[in-house]
């Protein structure tokens, strides 16, 4: 989804 949280989860 959109948002910083979504990016961190992918790390």
UniProtKB/Swiss-Prot annotation:
One GO term (biological process): neuropeptide signaling pathway
CC terms in the record's Gene Ontology section: extracellular region
Cell compartments where the protein resides: Secreted
Record-listed Leucine amide modification sites: 11
Keywords recorded for this protein, A-Z: Amidation, Neuropeptide, Secreted
Main location: secreted
Keyword Transcription: no
Cysteine-cysteine disulfides: none
Keyword Amino-acid biosynthesis: no
Entry similarity comment: Belongs to the FARP (FMRF amide related peptide) family.
Entry function: FMRFamides and FMRFamide-like peptides are neuropeptides.
Name under which the protein is recorded: Extended FMRFamide-9
